[in-house]
Amino acid sequence: MEVRPIGWICGQVVKNFSGRLEGLQKAIMDLIDEFKDDLPTILRLSQSSQKTDPVQKTSKVRMALALAKINRGTLIQGLNHISSSSKSVAKLLQPRLAYRLLELRSISHRLLREVNVASQPLHSVQMKRGSLFEIISFPAKTALTSIMYASYAALIYLAVCVNAVLAKIKKIFQEEESIRQNRESENFRKAFSEPALRKPMFSESEIKAKPYRSLPEKPDNLLDQPKPPANKQSNKIQVLHSVFDQLAELNE
């Protein structure tokens, strides 16, 4: 429930009392009208009494003077505020009063039952002591159970976090394994598709380009060598022809 300041509560009380004081308002207004009519005579009498025998003003005259000075509209407005505040305070206090009355009724019924009950045996007294101990230990039990529930909640949260971290680590390892397998398969495919070339044993600077020739150059010393005889050359040609004939027969 919201805490209100004392001034607001007093204002509400005054405001709520206005509805119940309508008769009082009417009586006060009639009294003011009556004193306003008799006020000049009262003032003259008071002045003459002061000249002859100074006597203190009575409470009635003072009240008449005070009421004459009060404005009727402001008085009615204040009484209306009092009535409305009293109503609001009554609305606020009504649930509490009803709850307190119910508590008092339950307590009175319980006390009446305990008074009217006859003398009880020993085991009932022990049961009462046990119930009293349970009542005393109830806050400790509730605190312990709340601590246990909080620890269970913390363990569940920790397990969820650990599972999430393990899932992320497993995913990272799976990605690395897939990347490694892809690399191995790619290297294996390259190894079978493209033959490995051996590196040359000599450097590129040692390679010298030579002009292309369809026929080998005749060395000069061949001119000096003697030519074979004609019969030997004819014999070699015959041997070659016979070899070619045999190969043709075999192919057929």
From Swiss-Prot:
Keywords: Developmental protein, Differentiation, Membrane, Spermatogenesis, Transmembrane, Transmembrane helix
Transmembrane regions listed in the UniProt entry: 145-167
GO cellular component: membrane
Signal peptide extent: none
Function: May play at role in testicular development/spermatogenesis and may be an important factor in male infertility.
Subcellular location: Membrane
Composition-biased stretches (Basic and acidic residues): 208-221
Topology of the protein relative to the lipid bilayer: Single-pass membrane protein
Protein's name according to its UniProt entry: Spermatogenesis-associated protein 9
KW ATP-binding (keyword) present: no
Protein's organism: Mus musculus
Domain of life: Eukaryota
PANTHER family recorded: SPERMATOGENESIS-ASSOCIATED PROTEIN 9
Region: Disordered, residue numbers: 208-235
GO BP field: cell differentiation; spermatogenesis
Family annotation (InterPro entries): SPATA9
Pfam families: SPATA9 (PF15824)
Coiled-coil stretches noted in the UniProt entry, renumbered to this chain: none
